[in-house]
């Protein structure tokens, strides 16, 4: 089971989240049939979204839109405060060769664009914030968003490692944030630690990457585990929801589906589940609409 662990330094000056999202990203790859680069880009976005949702309280939902002008198109993800996330990438077929060190390139194929977050508190007035893409590598873009939009200096590392067959081997990451009251010396100390940290891909390749991430962040310094939360890919789509969507269409469109198409098939963008509505189903909807 995937998990997110919330921690805080003994001094109370910093907090860190570390995540294992391997099963989540693996499931997303299976549902969307993504090729290598698309898998990594989508996976990083899902991880980033789970970090943002973990910062919220109550029954909030956070939507992340990574909107680029290059090969990937846009990536959309939605996460809630219960550890559930869903998402899709506009172009699942980007398959760029790895670098000499085995890294999968993402930034060059995201292009220029924006990192958009929409936080829904359930009050009917969602809050939207937009920052420019800095590198298109997702992790740096999330860190920039947190620092600029939420005014919380942050360091973020996240990645998806693939095996020889380009299947998800491991996925995860971390977020480190400065809390109010941190001294200049403490901030300087942690900045130096972050600069000296091994690459996120190296940490994820460790036998126990959760422990490796925590060790890289805190070293020998004491810290406290605040909570451990389970994470998973879970879509809330349903036949009833799509039936309601069909009901919202003009009657003429439903009649066209009935008489010309002999039915309708709706595919959920977020998870790929297909819902079939035969002629009898459409007749019921048309009658209910009358």
Curated annotation (Swiss-Prot):
The family assignment reads:
Belongs to the HSP33 family.
The record, for Pfam families, names: HSP33 (PF01430)
Which GO BP terms, alphabetically? Answer: protein refolding
Q: Name one GO molecular function term.
A: protein folding chaperone
The record describes the protein's role as: Redox regulated molecular chaperone. Protects both thermally unfolding and oxidatively damaged proteins from irreversible aggregation. Plays an important role in the bacterial defense system toward oxidative stress.
GO cellular component, alphabetical, reads: cytoplasm
Q: How is it modified after translation?
A: Under oxidizing conditions two disulfide bonds are formed involving the reactive cysteines. Under reducing conditions zinc is bound to the reactive cysteines and the protein is inactive.
Keywords attached to this Swiss-Prot or TrEMBL record, sorted alphabetically, are: Chaperone, Cytoplasm, Disulfide bond, Redox-active center, Stress response, Zinc
The scientific name of the source species is Streptococcus equi subsp. equi (strain 4047)
- Tree of life domain: Bacteria
Q: Does the keyword Acyltransferase apply?
A: no
InterPro entries per the UniProt record, alphabetical: Heat_shock_Hsp33, Heat_shock_Hsp33_C, Heat_shock_Hsp33_N
**Localisation:** Cytoplasm
Q: What is its main location?
A: cytoplasm
Q: Which cysteines are joined by disulfide bonds?
A: 235-237, 268-271
Report the protein name in the record.
Answer: 33 kDa chaperonin
Q: Which CDD domains match?
A: Hsp33 (cd00498)
């Amino acid at each position: 089971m995937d998990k997110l662990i919330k921690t805080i330094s003994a001094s109370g000056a910093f907090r860190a989240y570390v995540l294992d999202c391997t099963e989540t990203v693996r499931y997303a790859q299976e549902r969307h049939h993504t090729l290598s680069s698309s898998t990594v880009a989508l996976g990083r976005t899902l991880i980033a979204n789970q970090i943002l949702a973990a910062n919220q309280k109550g029954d909030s939902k956070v939507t992340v839109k990574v909107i680029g002008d290059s090969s990937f198109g846009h990536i959309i993800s939605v996460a809630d405060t219960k550890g559930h996330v869903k998402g899709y990438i506009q172009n699942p077929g980007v398959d760029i060769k790895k670098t000499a060190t085995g890294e999968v390139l993402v930034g060059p194929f995201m292009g220029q664009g924006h990192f958009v977050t929409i936080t829904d508190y359930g009050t009917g007035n969602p809050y939207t914030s937009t920052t420019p893409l800095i590198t298109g590598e997702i992790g740096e873009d999330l860190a920039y968003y947190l620092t600029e939009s939420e005014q919380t200096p942050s360091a973020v590392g996240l990645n998806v490692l693939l095996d020889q067959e380009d299947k998800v081997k491991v996925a995860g990451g971390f977020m480190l944030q400065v809390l109010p009251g941190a001294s200049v010396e403490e901030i300087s100390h942690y900045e130096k630690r972050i600069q000296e940290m091994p690459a996120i891909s190296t940490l994820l390749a460790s036998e126990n990457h959760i422990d490796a991430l925590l060790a890289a962040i805190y070293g020998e310094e004491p810290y406290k585990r605040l909570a451990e939360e389970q994470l998973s890919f879970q879509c809330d789509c349903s036949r009833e929801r799509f039936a309601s969507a069909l009901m919202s269409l003009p009657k003429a469109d439903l009649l066209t589906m009935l008489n010309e198409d002999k039915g309708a098939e709706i595919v959920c963008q977020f998870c790929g589940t297909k819902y079939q509505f035969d002629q009898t189903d459409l007749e019921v909807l048309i009658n209910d609409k009358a």
